[in-house]
Regions:
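Charged boundary/loop elements
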Residues: 1-180
Length: 180
């Protein structure tokens, strides 16, 4: 799984991109059946306000600016899509859903999700939120608790899966059948 491939006609790619750029994402975020703190977390990612190391440095905090998983500068785009560890996580998800590529950015995620899971639009935001939250939690464990570096992307994916199951628990029984 290497990067992003051009698939379909230019027109279909453009339509997918335009659809992804509309306010549809904001509606999906606030209507998603995920905890409010996760909705706020995802919104902070969207507006580049999560306190990654580069954002902390911009605020004057003196810290190592490198990613907890790799030796590259830690930005939102890098942490959630560009890091070697997170690329591997997205590759695992791609294999599970039968995709031949993985998203390389937040914007590409929406086109990718619409292409490979067109019948499951209600879970696009939930899946993205679970993976991003799992990456963030693992990053924070390394950053704040000084645990050994995570060498297993499967731990991140298992953590994301547990979030999805946990978040689905308080849902009504009618909605639960669509989650499992």
């Amino acid at each position: 799984m290497v990067g992003w491939k051009k698939v379909g006609s230019f027109l279909s790619q453009y339509k997918s991109w335009c659809e992804a750029e509309t306010g549809d994402r904001n509606k999906r975020l606030w209507k998603a059946k995920i905890p409010l703190k996760i909705k706020i977390f995802m919104w902070l990612i969207k507006v580049n306000a999560i306190l990654t190391r580069n954002n902390l440095a911009r605020k004057g905090w003196k810290c190592d600016k490198t990613c907890s998983f790799s030796a590259n500068p830690e930005s939102i785009e890098h942490l959630f899509f560009g890091c070697v560890m997170t690329k591997y996580c997205w590759s695992l998800v791609s294999i599970v859903i039968g995709a031949d590529c993985r998203p390389a950015s937040l914007n590409q995620y929406w086109v990718w999700a619409n292409r490979f899971m067109p019948a499951h639009k209600k879970i696009h935001m939930i899946g993205l939120a679970a993976i991003c939250w799992a990456i963030w939690r693992m990053r924070n464990s390394i950053f704040f608790e000084d645990i050994k570096k995570c060498r297993s992307p499967t731990k991140i994916i298992c953590l994301a899966s547990s979030f999805i199951l946990y978040w689905s628990d308080p849902q009504s029984s009618d909605d639960k059948s669509n989650w499992r």
